[in-house]
């Protein structure tokens, strides 16, 4: 929020250096970001009047001007500008003058003709057409103000103000106004506050004969006020008003629009003006938008509305998006004759959601969404009407329409002086506290504080204590050391993720971090069918672009995209992992399910299915998880048929591992085979075993037997291992696959699978007969699959 010190002086007079002012306001809770004293870089530049012009004898594009600068004799200035005419008032930089950017002007000769200064453009004065819309970008700045010849240009065009920039927190919307900051200034310096009560004469008639207002949603619109002005004269605003708007960073447009902006800055109450002839049947309806309804806003954009949005409509269609922006159709035009001024109080959360969904944030919405005071509507509307009469911009029709459903009861907050002293660590009497609250217009009655309507942030004792502290002075509160300690606690789930990280790094993998946003086209790249459930994604309302328009439901595209980047940067091999989140929409819920997963990907070097499978098994072992079973699946569209398996522990499917489908690899531009594993971290945590227990080293020797069998090509080795383990029983210490062979003399459609079995008993040395019997049990159990011993 920019504050013009000249504007502030209208409400409270502060006679103190600007640096001290900024320090005092900051220490009282209104943080100052900085300040700018206008015109400090401009020196010895005055208003000049062009008396005569003649062409330069040695140039076809330069002119010799005789300029009256308020001295006894005119000065001669040579210029190359083509827009200067006799009688023009212009900024004249005289000999030894200074301009922004460290430029110094001295007299000299231009192609043999003496020039005693320079006629200045906007740019040379450090200004733009934003400051003076009537001026041109290229050429001399021709003044349209009523200026005195020889007057300092800074005074002539209003560059003699000091502008202070405040950082206003979201809980103080009242300070997004000149009056709000004037209240803070008066309270800080204990000075009287001079608030002006608007006076409107009126030109007769009755507003109710011209306009009808109906509020259908009183929850979202607590108060709606309207007034009518007829016979308006759209023109440029007077200089003083334009200077104040410019100082606060608002571009002057015309008197009607400028009045609404002026009142918004002065009162903090957004205003809007409608052209009455475009309000059908003279009827304004405050209602929710209809499904599929659209409006073309003042910026020329067609916007689609939804039923939760509040609009200001006439008898047929919306005229404005409540609290955000007006409609182009009903805006002020050159032929506008009668207007409606609107001053309303809309629910902050509704305005915020509407502005966010439409992707447009305005000065108006920024104020409404913080929550405004319904009691401020009347003063702001009357001030706008007063300015209309003051500027001669139109005739105010008598009366105003006021649809008021707001609760005007002032909030009462408990007041406890002893509690506040303990809370703040100070020692003030009750009377001193009451006295410190009085400049803030907070009245103490008994054990309660009566809070002004514009201070919606004061809700409890701690809030009142803060007001006492800032009026007492934060710098006066003694510094005390903090007592007590807080210890950070790592949850079991967080520790589990740390162990996963450590295990993956120990196995030589590099961690990656990717965005949770992605493009819908990624689903096409991983070959998901159009009706696949994983395509149901959370859609971002206002994305940065299509590439970040949805939340991912699978971490596979992010992993493959990173593998592709490594491959395209000629990295011969990549071993990557990521602990990421997948976002799954939930029926009837606003927020999605956020699922933590471990994605592991690799290509090149020794990467293959069994290497990645070994990584997964090693990880499960390090995490003290049960051994997982692998079940081949050939239907996943993103993986190679027959080279993809899901992992289960008991009945719980904890993840998958597989080779990426060649088509998917081609879509990502990966020119080699790649493998990806996915593990659900929450399920891993759920199936983990109790803390590991340790046993003494075995006292008896082990016996190793190799077992080679012939089975169907389609039979998973996991089924063989599970059968052997169950048949041999607890004397089987370890089973390890060491060979898979296809080809002669093994029959076609068959494969040879060889295991190494380590047998050991805890209480004795196994005999040869016991070992042979164990192998026989295994073969008998395997026979159910048609498995035979390889000769």
Give, region by region, the residue ranges found by the protein language model:
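Phosphate-backbone binding interfaces of nucleic-acid-interacting proteins
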Residues: 1-205, 340, 359, 363, ...
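Terminal amphipathic helices with adjacent charged low-complexity linkers/tails
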Residues: 189-215, 392-420, 427
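Mobile "lid/hinge" segments at catalytic clefts and subdomain interfaces of large enzymes
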Residues: 111-131, 135-136, 140-141, 154, ...
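Extended, well-folded interaction surfaces typified by the phenylalanyl-tRNA synthetase beta subunit core
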Residues: 180, 413-572, 705, 758-762, ...
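Glycine/proline-enriched, intrinsically flexible loops and inter-domain linkers
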Residues: 4-5, 23, 63, 189, ...
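A carboxyl-terminal module marker
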Residues: 2, 439-442, 457, 586-599, ...
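Beta-rich nucleic-acid/ligand-interaction surfaces
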Residues: 39-43, 200-203, 263, 485-491, ...
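Conserved mixed alpha/beta core segments that line enzyme active sites in large multi-domain catalysts
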Residues: 47-77, 243, 254, 260-329
């Amino acid at each position: 929020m920019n504050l013009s010190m000249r504007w502030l002086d209208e409400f409270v007079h502060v006679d103190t250096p600007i640096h001290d002012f900024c320090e005092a306001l900051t220490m009282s809770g209104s943080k100052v970001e900085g300040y700018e004293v206008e015109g400090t870089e401009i020196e010895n530049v005055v208003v000049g009047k062009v008396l005569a012009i003649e062409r330069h004898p040695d140039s076809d594009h330069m002119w010799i001007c005789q300029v009256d600068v308020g001295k006894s004799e005119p000065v001669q200035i040579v210029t190359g500008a083509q827009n200067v005419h006799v009688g023009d008032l212009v900024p004249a930089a005289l000999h030894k003058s200074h301009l922004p950017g460290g430029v110094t002007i001295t007299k000299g000769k231009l192609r043999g003709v003496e020039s005693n200064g320079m006629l200045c453009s906007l740019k040379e004065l450090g200004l733009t057409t934003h400051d003076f819309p009537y001026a041109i970008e290229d050429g001399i700045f021709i003044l349209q103000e009523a200026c005195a010849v020889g007057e300092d240009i800074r005074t002539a065009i209003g560059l003699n103000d000091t502008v202070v920039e405040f950082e206003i927190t979201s809980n103080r919307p009242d300070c997004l106004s000149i009056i709000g900051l004037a209240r803070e200034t008066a309270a800080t310096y204990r000075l009287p506050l001079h608030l002006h009560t608007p006076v409107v004469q009126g030109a007769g008639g009755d507003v109710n004969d011209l306009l009808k207002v109906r509020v259908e949603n009183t929850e979202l619109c607590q108060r709606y006020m309207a007034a009518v002005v007829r016979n308006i004269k759209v023109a440029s605003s007077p200089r003083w008003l334009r200077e104040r708007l410019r100082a606060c960073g608002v571009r002057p447009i015309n008197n009607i629009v400028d009045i609404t902006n002026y009142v918004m800055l002065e009162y903090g109450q957004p205003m809007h003006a409608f052209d009455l002839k475009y309000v059908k049947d003279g009827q304004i309806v405050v209602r929710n938008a209809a499904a599929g309804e659209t409006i073309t806003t003042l910026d020329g954009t067609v916007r689609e509305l939804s039923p939760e949005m509040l609009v200001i409509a006439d008898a047929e269609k919306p005229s404005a998006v409540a609290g955000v922006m007006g409609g182009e159709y009903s805006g002020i035009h050159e032929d506008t004759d009668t207007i409606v001024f609107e001053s309303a109080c809309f629910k902050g959360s509704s305005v915020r959601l509407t502005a966010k969904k439409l992707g447009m944030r305005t000065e108006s919405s920024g104020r409404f969404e913080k929550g405004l005071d319904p009691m401020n509507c009347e003063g702001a509307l009357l001030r706008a009407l007063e300015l209309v009469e003051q500027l001669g911009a139109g005739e105010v029709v008598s009366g105003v329409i006021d649809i008021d459903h707001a609760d005007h009861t002032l909030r009462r907050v408990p007041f406890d002086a002893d509690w506040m002293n303990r809370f703040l660590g100070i020692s003030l009497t009750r009377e001193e506290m009451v006295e410190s609250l009085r400049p803030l217009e907070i009245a103490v009655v008994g054990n309660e504080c009566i809070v002004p309507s514009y201070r919606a942030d004061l809700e409890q004792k701690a809030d009142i204590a803060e007001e006492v502290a800032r009026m007492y002075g934060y710098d006066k509160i003694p510094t005390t050391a903090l007592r007590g300690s807080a210890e950070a606690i790592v949850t079991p789930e967080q520790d589990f993720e740390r162990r996963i990280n450590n295990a993956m790094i120990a196995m030589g993998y590099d961690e990656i971090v990717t965005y949770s946003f992605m493009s819908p086209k990624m689903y096409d790249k991983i070959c998901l069918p159009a009706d696949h459930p994983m395509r149901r994604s959370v859609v971002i309302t206002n994305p940065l672009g299509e590439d970040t328009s949805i939340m991912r439901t699978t971490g596979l595209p992010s992993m493959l995209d990173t593998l592709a980047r490594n491959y395209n940067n000629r990295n011969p091999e990549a071993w990557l992992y990521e602990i990421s989140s997948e976002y799954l929409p939930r029926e009837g819920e606003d927020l999605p399910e956020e699922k933590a997963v471990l994605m592991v990907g690799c290509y090149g070097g020794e990467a293959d299915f069994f290497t990645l499978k070994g990584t997964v098994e090693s990880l499960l072992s390090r995490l003290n998880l049960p051994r997982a079973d692998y079940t081949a699946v050939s239907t996943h569209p993103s993986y190679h048929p027959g080279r993809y398996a899901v992992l289960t522990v008991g009945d719980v499917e904890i993840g998958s591992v597989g080779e990426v489908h060649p088509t998917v690899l081609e879509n990502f531009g990966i020119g080699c085979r790649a493998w990806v594993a996915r593990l659900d971290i929450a399920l891993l945590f759920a199936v983990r075993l109790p803390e590991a227990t340790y046993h003494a080293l075995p006292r008896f020797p082990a016996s190793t037997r190799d077992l080679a069998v012939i089975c169907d090509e389609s039979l998973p080795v996991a089924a063989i291992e599970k059968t052997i383990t169950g048949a041999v029983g607890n004397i089987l210490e370890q089973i390890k696959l060491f060979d898979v062979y296809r080809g002669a003399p093994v029959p076609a459609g068959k494969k040879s699978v060889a295991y190494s079995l380590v047998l050991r008993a805890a209480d004795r040395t196994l005999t040869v007969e016991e070992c042979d019997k164990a192998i026989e049990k295994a073969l008998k159990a395997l026979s159910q699959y048609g498995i035979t011993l390889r000769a």
